[in-house]
Amino acid sequence: MKLHELSDNPGATKKRKRVGRGPGSGTGKMGGRGIKGQKSRSGVAINAYEGGQMPLYQRLPKRGFNKPNRKKFAVVNLGLIQKFIDAGKLDGKADITEDALVASGLVRRKLDGVRVLAKGDVSGKLNITVTGASKAAIDAVSAAGGALTVSAPAAAE
């Protein structure tokens, strides 16, 4: 057997249908597209339609939900607070409150409060009062001789 002697099984291939080539062809004029409408126009694809195969967005399981009244905190790292103190934008000797952080420009908006995280180092004794803080941040400030107080968020009016 040689390569040029190989052929497909009978019925394995179909001839391509030439569409829109006159009434004698059987698929002339409309070319199997019907009359008007989005599907009869060229260049139109229906989004997420996969040719009848179950679409990806339906194959994946539904999972989780978004809490409608979730609290959003402005996040600040200890290293940034220290950087602002070193630059003279924040007073390290006075109590550092959420309003002081906003006034210095470190936090743009308080949102539902400010949360302090432990990234960076603290080189002095700081007294910080905020709505939230990580355990590592509280430990880092107290190790430097300061105090990080977590106050309850103000009730919405």
From Swiss-Prot:
> What InterPro entries would the database entry show?
Ribosomal_uL15, Ribosomal_uL15/eL18, Ribosomal_uL15/eL18_sf, Ribosomal_uL15_bac-type, Ribosomal_uL15_CS
Q: Name a GO molecular-function annotation.
A: structural constituent of ribosome
Q: Give the record's GO biological process terms.
A: translation
**Any one GO cellular component localisation term in the record:** large ribosomal subunit
Sorted keywords for this record are:
Ribonucleoprotein, Ribosomal protein, RNA-binding, rRNA-binding
- Family membership, please give it: Belongs to the universal ribosomal protein uL15 family.
Q: How does it assemble?
A: Part of the 50S ribosomal subunit.
The protein depicted here goes by the name Large ribosomal subunit protein uL15
Organism this protein belongs to:
Jannaschia sp. (strain CCS1)
Gene, per the UniProt record: rplO
